[in-house]
Amino acid sequence: MWGRGFLQRARFAQLSPSSSSSRSLLSAASAAPPNLLYSHYQRGRWFGCSTANMAPVRDPNTLSNYDAWRTRHTTANLKIDFTAKCLRGSVILELESQTDKASKEIVLDSSYVTVNSIKLNSAPSLWETKARTEPNGSPVHIAVPEGAAKGEVVKVEIELATTDKCTALQWLTPAQTSDKAAPFMFSQCQAIHARSLFPCQDTPDVKSTYDFNITSPYVVVASGVPVPDETKDLGEEKLYKFQQKVPIPSYLFALSSGEIASAPVGKRSCVCTGPNELKASQWELEGDMDKFLEAAEKIVFPYRWGEYNVLVLPPSFPYGGMENPIFTFATPTIISGDKQNIDVIAHELAHSWSGNLVTSCSWEHFWLNEGWTMYLERRILASIHGGDAHFDFSAIRGWKALEEAIKEYGEDHEFTKLCISHKGIDPDDAFSTVPYEKGFHFVWSLDRLVGRENFDKFIPYYFGKWSNKSLDSYEFKDTFLEFFSAPEYSDLKDKIASIDWEGRFHSTGLPPKPEFDTSLADVCYELAEKWKSKDFTPSPSDVASWTGNQVLVFLNAVQDFEEPLTVEQSQALGKAYGLSESKNAELKAAYYHIAMRSKDASAYQGVADLLGEVGRMKFVRPLFRGLNKVDRELALKTFEKNREFYHPICRQMVEKDLGVSEAANSS
Ligand SMILES: [Zn+2]
């Protein structure tokens, strides 16, 4: 995912609008005293095996007994009901017994989902939904009176409907889409929201193949390969079929439906989005998709999923992106008219290997997904844009984000560890940039330790060995040590023995800081220095050869000046570098923050206009806070005007920021 902390805050706000996100983090941390860390995990690893060869439950965020039963195939027969805003239908789980008739019940995760009936091997069965506990929800217990022989597969068919408390689905009104003609829906199951769609073994430690049979009045996209010949007309509705033949964890189950058009953007890729955005989206991605895929394949090995498509969500999508297989779900702010923000796509594509093919077995080892993905993303982009300086430039930006995150948590905080105990913790609450950037730094440190040439041989070995499987940090360590114990690497023996695995996995705070190649960043800071002088005359050529991210680093440096720019300087900045006219929301937003700080009133309407075009919280919340400081009336007017356009989570956050929420009024 590419959410960078926003998901966690948004979710918390939704549940408890009057509390601050930092409080949730503190209370979450205090819920897990240090002596309990990893106890669940260790119990599973050391003592949990009651039957020989049975893999233990090692994910504290599931209540399922997946040590006794494992889902092998899932069939989702679901109807998307836009009027009632729910999914209804049946889901069939095919579970393989891991014991020899020892287990007499199947326990599944569920959360705010209505179960109407459950059949076991086509016969009505005894089942019960047990009381809800946080953060893991309400387990569904299904009796299997005779048990099943080891290796035998039983079929569990569940009739169900989602509820209005479902945490996995977002329903947009026509007003929240760009052509305002039809409603739109999409799912977001990471981390533990799949259980809110249907009862399942909602753990990344279990992988299943999928059949999707989805009925909707609008076009459907799912995390499987479309089976177009089998789309059936059912009067007002259509049945859309998809297949996912690569086993995937539950958090990668994904659906979206609405007025969706598609256009090719590469040999294996199409872009799907609203008809109004199709042309611009196609232009933005065309040409680069094949390059990204080829670069990634060169680093790891050939792409194994068939198609790689991108679904660009409506402007009110509040997040960055989600690596749902076959169809990455992406923020529309990547469509910036300058191809400068599509690094999100390199990130989500990299997940096709790290995360989707090779998966962390629980959210405690999430860095295996995101740290590796940041590493691959930077390798992909460096190979396309030309080398190490680009890699380091991106890593420098990441390091800054990591420093900020660790500063915000406090450097002793549990959530600043690479491996984070999740006992009693909702993974969304522990979500931050830490697993991304601290994970990246660990992977990169191993790369530098053994040398690029050697590390490049390890990469396909690791991803090959763990394809279609899930692993923990210790299995990663074992794999690394095993690979480099080969005789041809004997000269690396001392270096490898020097790796502080325990320190890397369990220390809080920043990891050791590497030497960066700062050449691409230095020019940004040098230009910013020049702007400190009031008589500096800017010229478009100052930034003409720069990437969008370089301009961003420069703008952030200017924003951090002790003294704001004068109104004249700020206007000259916008004009000389084409910032006020830019379609790039990243650059435009950064510029408007400088303009607002300079009290350049001529820019305020531009801020208001931008706030009517983007719904990604990364931009919306800071812009509203900025506008509120300089022109509260315009801020309130802009919010009222766009209220229906924003996603409910975003709307609620902005209400709080502007002090117009009901909670704020009553307190
Ligand atoms: Zn990611």
Curated annotation (Swiss-Prot):
It catalyses: an epoxide + H2O = an ethanediol. The keyword Membrane does not apply. One of its GO terms (biological process) is protein catabolic process. Binds 1 zinc ion per subunit. It is found in: Cytoplasm; Nucleus. Keywords: Cytoplasm, Hydrolase, Metal-binding, Metalloprotease, Nucleus, Protease, Zinc. Zn(2+) binds at residues 347, 351, 370. GO terms for molecular function: aminopeptidase activity; epoxide hydrolase activity; metallopeptidase activity; zinc ion binding. Aminopeptidase that preferentially cleaves di- and tripeptides. Also has low epoxide hydrolase activity (in vitro). Can hydrolyze the epoxide leukotriene LTA(4) but it forms preferentially 5,6-dihydroxy-7,9,11,14-eicosatetraenoic acid rather than the cytokine leukotriene B(4) as the product compared to the homologous mammalian enzyme (in vitro). NCBIfam families: leuko_A4_hydro (TIGR02411). Belongs to the peptidase M1 family. This is Leucine aminopeptidase 2. The lineage of its organism: Eukaryota, Fungi, Dikarya, Ascomycota, Pezizomycotina.
